[in-house]
UniProtKB/Swiss-Prot annotation:
Xref: Gene3D superfamilies: DsrEFH-like
Identification of the protein by name: Protein TusC homolog
A Pfam family recorded for this sequence: DsrE
Coiled-coil stretches noted in the UniProt entry, renumbered to this chain: none
Keywords, sorted A to Z: Cytoplasm
Gene this chain is encoded by: tusC
Source organism, top-level taxon: Bacteria
Its job: Could be part of a sulfur-relay system.
Family: Belongs to the DsrF/TusC family.
InterPro entries for this protein: DsrEFH-like (IPR027396), Sulphur_relay_DsrE/F-like (IPR003787), Sulphur_relay_TusC/DsrF (IPR017462)
Signal peptide: none
Species for this entry: Vibrio vulnificus (strain CMCP6)
Localization of this protein: Cytoplasm
Gene Ontology cellular component terms for the protein in this record: cytoplasm
Presence of the UniProt keyword Acetylation in the record: no
Amino acid sequence: MSQLTYLFRTAPHSHSSGREGVDALLAASAYCEAISVVFIGDGVYQLLAGQQTASILCKDYAPMFKLFDLYDIEHVYVCQQSLQQRGLTSEDLLIEVEVVDTAQLQGVLHNSAQLLSF
């Protein structure tokens, strides 16, 4: 079975790509079991707990990440270097993730048959 990987690289709420990525990911999970999700660069902010979106008049879609368990999305990776550069740890995130180094991240991306970037 081919591996489908969703790559989140952008900060939330600056444009709609994060929300669109989550929507696409949850929809694809109904048809594909081999899904990985990777958060790198500013994409790690997508998972940041405690986001307050009311003041910027944006819908808070961060709780949708908590649906990953319900949709059997088990392979969720966050770049260790990206977290460190932003002064974050896995405890700052909404959901449990596997924090991986650059070499491990390259392996995940290399094993992907399809890569969708948001």
